[in-house]
Amino acid sequence: FFFLIIVNHLVAQIPIPVAGKIDRIENFKSKFVTARNIDIWLPEGYTKNKKYAVLYMQDGQGLYDANITWNHQSWEVDDVLTSLVNKNSIKEAIVVGIWNGQTSRHVEYFPQKPYDCLTPIEKDTVTAQLQRASRTKDFFQPKSDKYLQFLVKELKPFIDSAYSTHPNKANTFVAGSSMGGLISMYAICEYPNVFGGAICMSTHWPGT
């Protein structure tokens, strides 16, 4: 119980970036997935007078500040992007950190259409493997199509209306690692007219 209090306190804190600023949208509502926090990183000197590319990143809890993550590790996205921009290696971008659904992470990140093509025996095997890994208690059924609908039909339009973005494909990217890499790959396959690129690091190819 005490551990849960500590964890809840940590994840509730807003990350402190090395550069730029972070806007948090608390419990962003969706008709497709459960409500979740969205941590939006704005680069140093962000202004409404110019347009920015947007990078949508999975597992948004761990992107910016290692001091408040459960394992005291982070991607240090704000630090890395600021360094790359200063070297003129990339253009400035807004980062949208999408918190995972915690207990629903595997359900939301597992590519749905490939799973639906499996035989009943293969689906039983996937369920058994996930149950052994304590990633599901019931028969496994992905909901990644709904997750991507949330991303494309609800979150992206909100970001494009609330911030100064280039909304076109050439300036819209998605990224993640492990299962986050898998859903990012699925995102660009399902919505090639929305995303111009995907970063799929250490992709969890088996999905179990």
Question: Which ranges hold each PLM region?
Answer:
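Non-catalytic cap/lid and distal C-terminal segments of serine-dependent acyl enzymes
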Residues: 13-208
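Bacterial Sec-dependent N-terminal signal peptides
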Residues: 1-16
